[in-house]
Amino acid sequence: MSVSDDQRPAATTDFVTANAHAFGPARHLRSRTKVLPEHARGHNRALVLQTLYHSGAMSRADLSRETGLTRVTISDLVAEFIADGIVVEIGVREAVGPGKPPILIDIDRVGHQIIGLDLSGPTAFEGAVLSLDGDVLERRQVPRPATPDGDAAYDALRGLAQTLVEIATQPVLGVGIGTPGVVRPDGLVLSSPNLGWTDFPLEAKLSADLDLPVLARNDANAAVLAEYTFGEAEADFMLIKIGRGVGAGLITGSQPLLGSRFAAGEIGHVVVGTDGGPRCACGKIGCLEAWLSVSRMQEALDADPAAREEILRDSGTRMAIAIAPIVAALDLSEVVLSGPAELLDGTLIDAAVETLHARTLEGVFEDVMVRLTRQDDIVLRGAAVMVLSGQLGVS
């Protein structure tokens, strides 16, 4: 479905500024590799789309100056993007002098939509139709299977995805999924005990069923992309997602860190302390997840409301014990928490900061911040970043 010219906003200065990005100056992930000649065209395509996405509407001449590409290259690429329906001409800039005002171009932000899926909730799978700027336009959810049944989990996910594709009002650019577990870059879920998946080709299977591009990542890795792209995070940080389980995503040098086994950030089953503790679902005693998961903290608080400060302080201390070596080894500047503010904000964060500073080098890591994310729907927005990166080279 296309958008007619009379439905598009006029290309005023206010419109251009507003559309630079819905959440402010989003940033892109940096590449650590040199561009080979045979890859130059793909690099140039991504550079142009990246510039338009983050900077907003501009003329072809502006785009040439901003990217350093020749005007001929820009003209060829823009013509290709317009033919593909990715870029649109949105009017002319207000005249400020003699001569013909330049035509402004931008990503077709209203001409495509993204489907985002979050499988990390304790009782439901969440899904949304999102704009290219990460705004949630429509949302739906389906109950999460009560037991780890891989077939039932996939059936529920597929039904939710199909519903969202049907209610999308523009062509779907792709589907992004944030799922618990260890996920390879090709979208194969190596292990997700909570969903009953082992070596499950989630990305390939759903793509075949929907006939759409699908990208699947660990839910914390999706969340960290959203925090970096749309949030206020630095170039080196960790995001800890606290919900049914506990997991982390890491950005170092403006690049996601996945690890050799694609399990970087799997901190939930690190044993914290030698004083025993609650038994974890994995069978071990004293895993971080057994101390820090939302259900565990809430159960402890319900059992002894008078001990609220002590319970939350202990949880924050255990978390800091687990992450202090990571903060020091990677020289991270901040730790961002995603989860219920009523549990994480205040006492828990204060205890984490105190313990983190006590367990790292004095005078070096004293400015490391621990804070809550200010974003809602962080996994869904991370799913949008995944699709933008995979389909357009935009991140």
Give the location of each predicted region.
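ATP-binding/phosphotransfer module of carbohydrate and carboxylate kinases, centering on a glycine-rich
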Residues: M1-Q141, T147-P171, F230-G231, T274, ...
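Phosphate-binding/catalytic loop of phosphoryl-transfer enzymes
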Residues: L117, P171-G178, V182-G283, C287-L288, ...
